[in-house]
């Protein structure tokens, strides 16, 4: 099995820069699996005013990731049992990933880390777009596409389920059938980097 990290673009002033370096190392150490990062390359560091990323740049980044994923399928690289971890679940390429895997009969698993979305009134999607049908239906579709939907806290899970009530039946299950999992974000690397400040 190979774990493919479909990462979020690294912004120097955010933890996404640290994840680019440390997340592959942590996953390799904890799973003993082969880990590969599917990166979209360099991205503009200037963020869209009022946001933490560049609204145009993030889509260029994701388009480059999608091209790589498509080529990996074309070249026969993706195998049964491979796992794709999206470090930001709000990535529409997950839909095309599932499309290719199912049409080609390749049994993969996909996980996504939900940071925010239209269901969060503090997020730019919640503030600027709100509950427009296109954004809500996109988030529903992405949720269903993921085998594992990872959230950092019960607060975040509750906020999601308050908006998408139909997904509440996944919360609290302790079987493999659950699609909702509360996990801590992968920041174990901070222990070493913060020890100097004790």
Q: Which residues does each predicted region cover?
A:
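Conserved donor-binding/catalytic core segment of Leloir-type glycosyltransferases
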Residues: 180-198
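Active-site proximal beta-strand in glycosyltransferases
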Residues: 83-90, 101-124
